[in-house]
């Protein structure tokens, strides 16, 4: 194996005499730092490879002249083979990949792949689905002519290996013997990590034309899939941004930060969407995997120097098959060893990322019995060559980084390609050489997961269909299906392990290939208290996030004795109208995630809320918050109840005798955003749009210059501003010294100015903005501040009796905690039971004086276990403290949340805490304990 790899080396331009000396710029070059280099000239550019293939000398000269030091390339990528008919990037663009100052838009990248695929039968190109803004993702397939011609056979074989129930041992052995594995590479997911879409164009050409033994091995024994730009909207936005602001930037300190938006909604969290599948790009990439079932997926990112190959520090997610964990180590060690042997410093593994959270793009494969991997390659984001100075922590010698990066170096876009491409080729080469083992492991892991579902508890989850929050139940069941997990409905009643099953209940049987993934989604997470700081959330338990019931069954007999029917389409659970006569309809409060949609669907029907309990009959008493519908159109109400999953009681007027009600009049809403962080407000916009809510979207730079806000709006929603953010940072915004900084659409930069625009994003909201918010509330508006956004009204004194606790010893890194309803008649608590799960990450931790505790709607549980899933180190200090609070200020209200109730569109069970604030915006003082 080693000799075949060594023979793949092409030109070996890393000569001893130049290996450690600084690079020299080409003579006459004025830029500082230099953009081109001549270290290679004394050795010349060979015209052919050691295996006799002609070299594209013009392309190769550009590769080398844009590489800052000889140690930053190797014999795999220090040249490019020539071909008389296959279109190279230089043939298409007029220059090689990695040219200083050049990044390509999506259409240009796709244009090249179309040209490449049109010139060789070893490359195919096709468009995938569209993003929210109408740009397509794309798929590039590279392999031998024979392998590409039988892709349908390969797809069928991989799908058979993924389901051992339908494939015998003998059939699996035949498939493993006959088909190549598919290795999938994703580029450009994080838009300001700009190198991978460039690199993949050259890599595809090299795979198509090179006769190097290494490349021939890959072509014959593997098929490479590439998604060159996983986030097309953000790619174009970023390319425009760097052309607009960084074209003449040659110092990292002078770099203008990237665009405020990537996709329409989602920023960096597009790599945290694997659990909820909200973004179109995530949906497309999951769909791609479920269609092809490729055994290896590899996500290309950029950050730390020079090339980090993922394994992670642990603790690893306990549902990952040990084979997969071993494959992580095996592959990464091979890549680190190979590139280090080529003399390339700074290639390492282990000490970055944990391996616990399953919502990353690479975990689309890890959670489904395949291998998920990622790179972090050193990158500048903008395409100019600049000097980079590294911290000591990045340059220390460690067991996992025996050859560290330099303290200071010149770094170029071409260097980025020179590291990323040979790493990826080395990994695909390893898979091709070990084709049978990769496929056999894929089969074994699928079989292991299936067998665990048959032999280890839980053997099933029962999700009752008849729950209060029918919409939430259906949403969870549908999301499980979209994840590729098989769902059933009970065809009969029964009792299994003390769990009652009714006909029509949803059954998640664990005897299926994705049992391990189903388990990690459904069960409690217990993150070790002594583990290093996790890379992301440590809890995501579906039933808790959706605030629905699901019961684990510990007895395997349910798999053999309960008759079930497979679910083959998305489900809905209809509501119903009970009672035969009456003039009034009472809607049972349920705090469902579609509460706002349901209210909007009623249109002009008068709707009010009962502020106390209401007795329907001697057996049924509704909690505070029941809706009263005044209409004579019974069919309209029945259709509405069925569609939205609500239980409605038809009663006579006398049922409401003595009841206190208030109107649920729909407010005019504005969503306030900052220019420093659009990530969390993007999730809020997504959620509002899913609810069909109309709202105005206003930036911090405008809010103080719009006149009286109350003349325009009733509700001002200010979403979470990121973990541990402060009022000072929120208020100050972007540094004025960096301005003026426009984000506006122009003919030169057509992707800018959306979803919002600004002629100057710096300077924050200013005192004018604070005064505008204060006046808005005093004049009768409701200001809703979520998560860290609540620090703004708190630290600037808009609320006198509420403060933020210092919580140095409290560590809650994205967990699900137990909340309790402090006042059942508080409008913010309408529809919730005595307790509810609350997503929480790093505060803020609220404290309310005893004189104002009537404003507490939800508190963290005061007794028993606080943590429902995850970890809360030092969480005892949070017990009994407020989580959701409202207070009347002037004629209006301020509502604050000590957590993000709209987190990544995951915690749907918390959404009604926001919807209740919107629907009851001018009656938040209602109830016996209120200040109405």
Regions found by a protein language model. Give the residues of each.
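Aromatic (phenylalanine/tyrosine) cluster motif
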Residues: 5, 19-21, 37
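Active-site-proximal cap/loop segments of hydrolase catalytic domains
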Residues: 235-263, 267-270, 280-283, 287, ...
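Bacterial N-terminal signal peptides
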Residues: 9-22
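Intrinsic-disorder/low-complexity accessory segments
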Residues: 29-223, 266, 272, 278-280, ...
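Short, solvent-exposed turn/loop segments enriched in Gly/Ser/Thr/Pro and often Arg
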Residues: 227-231, 242, 300-307, 789
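Signal peptide processing junction and immediate N-terminal pro/mature segment
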Residues: 20-31
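Carboxylate/His-rich catalytic cores and anion/metal-binding grooves
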Residues: 204-208, 221-244
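N-terminal secretory signal peptides that target proteins for export/translocation
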Residues: 1-7
């Amino acid at each position: 194996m080693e000799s075949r790899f060594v023979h793949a080396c092409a030109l070996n331009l890393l000569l001893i005499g130049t290996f450690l000396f600084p690079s020299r710029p080409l003579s006459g070059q004025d830029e500082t730092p230099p953009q081109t280099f001549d270290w290679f000239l004394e050795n010349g550019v060979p015209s052919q490879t050691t295996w006799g293939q002609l070299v594209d000398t013009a392309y190769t000269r550009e590769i080398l002249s844009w590489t800052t030091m000889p140690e930053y390339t190797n014999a795999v990528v220090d040249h490019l083979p020539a071909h008389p008919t296959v279109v190279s990037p230089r043939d298409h663009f007029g220059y090689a990949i990695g040219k200083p100052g050049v990044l390509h838009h999506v259409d240009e990248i796709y244009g090249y792949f179309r040209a490449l695929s049109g010139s060789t039968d070893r490359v195919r190109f096709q468009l995938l689905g569209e993003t929210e803004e109408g740009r397509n993702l794309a798929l590039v397939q590279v392999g031998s002519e024979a392998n590409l011609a039988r892709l349908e056979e390969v797809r069928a074989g991989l799908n058979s290996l993924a389901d051992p129930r339908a494939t015998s041992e003998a059939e699996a052995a035949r498939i493993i013997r006959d088909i190549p594995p598919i290795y999938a590479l994703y580029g450009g997911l994080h838009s300001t990590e700009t190198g991978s879409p460039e690199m993949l164009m050259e890599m595809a050409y090299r795979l198509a034309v090179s006769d190097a033994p290494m490349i021939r091995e890959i072509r014959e024994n593997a098929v490479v899939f590439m998604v060159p730009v996983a986030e097309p909207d953000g790619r174009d936005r970023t390319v425009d941004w760097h052309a607009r602001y960084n074209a003449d930037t040659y110092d990292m300190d002078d770099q203008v930060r990237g665009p405020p938006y990537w996709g329409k909604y989602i920023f960096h969290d597009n790599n945290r969407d694997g659990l909820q599948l909200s973004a179109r790009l995530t949906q497309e990439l999951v769909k791609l995997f479920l269609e092809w079932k490729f055994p290896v997926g590899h996500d290309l990112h950029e950050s730390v120097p020079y090339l980090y190959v993922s394994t992670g520090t642990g603790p690893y997610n306990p549902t990952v098959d040990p084979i997969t964990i071993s494959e992580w180590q095996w592959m990464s060690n091979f890549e680190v060893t190979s590139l280090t042997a080529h003399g390339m410093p700074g290639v390492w593994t282990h000490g970055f990322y944990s391996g616990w959270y399953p919502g990353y793009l690479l975990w689309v494969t890890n959670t489904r019995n395949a291998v998920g991997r990622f790179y972090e390659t050193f990158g500048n984001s903008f395409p100019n060559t600049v000097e980079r100075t590294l911290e000591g922590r990045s340059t220390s010698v460690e067991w996992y980084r025996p050859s560290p990066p330099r303290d200071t170096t010149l770094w170029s876009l071409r260097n980025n390609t020179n590291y990323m491409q040979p790493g990826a080729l080395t990994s695909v080469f390893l898979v091709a050489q070990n084709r049978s083992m990769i496929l056999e492991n894929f089969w074994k892991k699928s079989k292991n997961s299936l067998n665990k579902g048959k032999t280890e508890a839980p053997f099933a989850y029962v999700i009752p269909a008849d729950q209060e929050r029918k919409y939430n139940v259906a949403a969870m069941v549908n999301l499980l299906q979209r994840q590729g997990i098989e769902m059933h409905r009970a065809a009969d009643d029964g009792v299994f392990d003390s769990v009652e099953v009714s006909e029509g209940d949803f059954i998640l049987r664990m005897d299926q290939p994705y049992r391990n993934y189903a388990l990690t989604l459904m069960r409690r997470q217990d993150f070790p208290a002594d583990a290093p700081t996790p890379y992301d959330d440590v809890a995501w338990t579906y039933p808790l996030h959706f605030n629905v019931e699901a019961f684990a069954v510990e007895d395997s007999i349910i798999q053999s004795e309960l008759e079930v029917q497979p679910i083959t389409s998305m489900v809905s659970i209809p509501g119903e109208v009970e009672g035969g006569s009456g003039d009034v309809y009472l809607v049972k409060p349920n705090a469902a995630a579609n509460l706002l949609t349901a209210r909007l669907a009623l249109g002009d029907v008068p709707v009010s809320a009962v502020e106390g309990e209401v007795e329907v009959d001697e057996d049924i008493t509704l909690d505070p918050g029941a809706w009263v519908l005044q209409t004579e159109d019974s069919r309209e109400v029945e259709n509405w109840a069925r569609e939205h999953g609500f239980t409605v009681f038809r009663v006579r007027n006398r049922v409401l005798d003595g009841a206190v009600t208030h109107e649920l009049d729909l407010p005019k809403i504005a969503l306030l955003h900052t220019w420093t962080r659009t990530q969390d407000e993007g999730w809020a916009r997504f959620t509002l749009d899913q609810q069909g809510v109309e709202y105005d979207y206003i930036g911090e730079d405008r809010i103080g210059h719009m006149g009286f806000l109350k003349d325009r709006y009733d509700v001002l929603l200010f979403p979470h501003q990121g973990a541990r953010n402060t009022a000072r940072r929120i208020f100050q915004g972007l540094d004025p010294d960096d301005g003026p900084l426009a984000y506006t659409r122009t003919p030169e930069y057509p992707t800018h100015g959306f979803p919002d625009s600004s002629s100057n994003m710096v300077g924050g909201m200013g005192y004018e903005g604070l005064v505008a918010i204060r006046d808005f509330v005093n004049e009768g508006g409701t200001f809703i501040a979520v998560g860290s956004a609540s620090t703004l009204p708190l630290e600037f004194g808009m609320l006198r009796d509420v403060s933020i606790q210092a919580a140095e010893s409290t560590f809650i890194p994205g967990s699900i905690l137990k909340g309790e309803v402090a006042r059942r008649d508080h409008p913010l608590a309408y529809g919730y039971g005595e307790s509810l799960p609350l997503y929480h990450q790093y505060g803020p931790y609220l404290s309310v004086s005893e004189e104002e505790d009537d404003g507490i709607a939800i508190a963290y549980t005061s007794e028993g276990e606080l943590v429902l899933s995850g970890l809360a180190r030092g969480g005892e200090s949070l017990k009994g403290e407020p989580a959701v609070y409202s207070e009347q200020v002037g004629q209006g209200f301020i509502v604050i949340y000590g957590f993000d109730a709209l987190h990544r569109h995951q915690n749907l069970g918390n959404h009604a805490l926001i919807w209740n604030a919107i629907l009851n915006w001018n009656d938040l003082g209602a109830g016996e304990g209120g200040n109405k």
